[in-house]
From Swiss-Prot:
SUPFAM superfamilies, alphabetized: P-loop containing nucleoside triphosphate hydrolases (SSF52540)
Protein name in the entry: Guanylate kinase
Lineage: Bacteria, Pseudomonadati, Chlamydiota, Chlamydiia, Chlamydiales
PROSITE patterns: GUANYLATE_KINASE_1 (PS00856), GUANYLATE_KINASE_2 (PS50052)
Organism: Chlamydia caviae (strain ATCC VR-813 / DSM 19441 / 03DC25 / GPIC) (Chlamydophila caviae)
Function: Essential for recycling GMP and indirectly, cGMP.
Protein keywords: ATP-binding, Cytoplasm, Kinase, Nucleotide-binding, Transferase
Domain of life: Bacteria
Residues holding ATP: 25-32
Designated gene of the protein: gmk
Length: 204
């Protein structure tokens, strides 16, 4: 078995101050799988933020692990209380990132990793320092194949997501890093190298 390597972390060095990473991608591009792999290899260095959402969980999803699944009423109450650093309405459902959750991850000495949509990532970037990463499928045909294989959307929903992916793809040039996920392991190694490089980036 290959030994797990921990990313060096020294809170006393300015380059190692906890950071916020955002990972965005069209549905089906593989961002969730890649982030899960990262969390498994580096549990002491990185922690995924949990977005709040009003959408229904998929069969394999668990509240408190994948998202915080809440009612629209609760989401709007939190929105009125200014609990969100960013929020969006996407495909008729609300998604939001809590500033408190990011702060708690930072206090634990870990980097925060937010897996959020393109609009949310760019919104965060405009408010606080953020390392932005975009994951792309190699083609629209491959993206459609993955969505069909996932089987969590009706045909009309899948087509809506595919159309939206064109908008997301067009915004990829606003991200610092772009990974084309045509091979999962290769893409993971690229993602890991980005995190390690950012861990050692000097603050000038």
């Amino acid at each position: 078995m290959k030994d797990k390597v921990r990313v060096p972390f020294s809170p006393d060095h300015p380059s190692c101050a906890p950071k916020l990473f955002t990972i965005s991608a069209p549905a089906g591009a593989g961002k969730t799988t890649l982030v899960r792999m990262l969390a498994q290899e580096f549990p002491d260095s990185f922690q995924k933020t949990l977005s709040l959402t009003t959408r229904a969980p998929r069969p394999e999803e668990v509240s408190g692990i994948d998202y915080w699944f809440v009612s629209q009423e609760e989401f709007k109450q939190r929105l009125d209380s200014n609990n969100f650093l960013e929020w969006v309405l996407l495909f008729g459902e609300y998604y939001g990132t809590s500033r408190l959750e990011i702060d708690e991850i930072w206090k634990s000495g870990k980097h925060a990793v937010a897996v959020i949509d393109v609009e949310g990532a760019l919104s965060l970037k405009s408010k606080i320092p953020t390392v932005t990463i975009f994951i792309s499928a190699p083609s629209q045909e491959e993206l459609e194949r993955r969505l069909k294989y996932r089987g969590s959307e009706q045909d009309s929903q899948r087509q809506e997501r595919l159309q939206h992916s064109l908008i997301e793809q067009a915004a990829s040039n606003q991200f610092e890093y772009v990974i084309i996920n045509d091979d999962l392991q290769k893409s993971y190694e690229i993602l890991k190298s980005i995190f390690i490089a950012e861990e050692h980036r000097n603050v000038l």
